[in-house]
Structures are given as structure tokens and as C-alpha cells.
Amino acid sequence: EERVQALTGAMRSAWMQGDKTETVAEATALLAESKLVPELAAEAHYYRAKTLMAEGKPGVAAKDLVVLAKDTRTAYGAEAKYLLAQWYFDAGETEKAEKEVLDYIEVSTPHAYWLARSFVLLSDIYVKMGRELDARQYLLSLQQNYQADDDIAGMIKSRLAKLNKEE
């Protein structure tokens, strides 16, 4: 238990200092512990995934994202589900990205921001598939139903403007 506490502290410290190598090393060591509570395992997967993505290794990070995305009730899982779909989209796997987002919509999450980001991503997916009408409908619905004061409104506005310009 003391070892787990020490590894957790080292991982968090490395993360906060932006030490990518150490964050990955400590998270990996923590995940190797046999008596790790699920919350700490999720935190370790999250920090490792985010660090690997920042290092330009999204394919390696995807393994952690898949684990986290199984539980969208947590903040880590909610973000991971979105990031996984975004990674598929960026990798040119449009159908896989669409499937991931549609699955996210079905299982839902209490973390509205990540679900809203997923709807924006779905509109990008549909534009890429040539389904501009579907993309517009999702954006308009999101614009009407999502009221938080964050960057989502700007994303919706810019995408709708682009769609209107292409008509």
C-alpha cells in the first residue's frame, strides 16, 4: 500500500511538472501493482494516455483509451471515449469513428462537455462522408440544446458557417 501511495505521488508530480518520460514510467509501474483500486488504475491509464498523445503516439495511447472508454460515467472515461473517436477520425477510419460516437450517444455520460464534443466530431465525420445535411442537423440540435458557456458554441458556429458557405 505504501508503494502504491509513493508511485501515485510520483506519477501525479511528474504529470504536474510536465515530465512526460517520468509520467509514463510511473503510470506503467502503478498499473503493474496487483492491489490497485479501480480509481487509481483509471487515473494511471488517463495520465499515460494523455502523455503518449502529447508525445505524438496516439496509437500507443489508444490501448489506455480503450480501457478508460468502457466507463463513460467517469470524467476520465468520458474524455477517453471522445479521444478514441477523434483518433479514429484523424487516422482516416471514418466508419470506426462514427461507430464510436454513436455508441457513446447510446451509453451516454453525465459529462455533457465530452458528449457535446462528440456530437461536433460526428458532424465532422458526416461532412467527410458527404452527409452535410446530417452534419448540419446535429450541429443545429446541439446549438439548441447545449447551453454551457465553453468552447462548444464557437465550434458549432464555425462549422455551420463553413457548411453554409459550401452550399
Task: Identify the residue ranges that each predicted region occupies.
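Acidic, polar-rich low-complexity tracts and alpha-helical solenoid repeat scaffolds
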Residues: 1-167
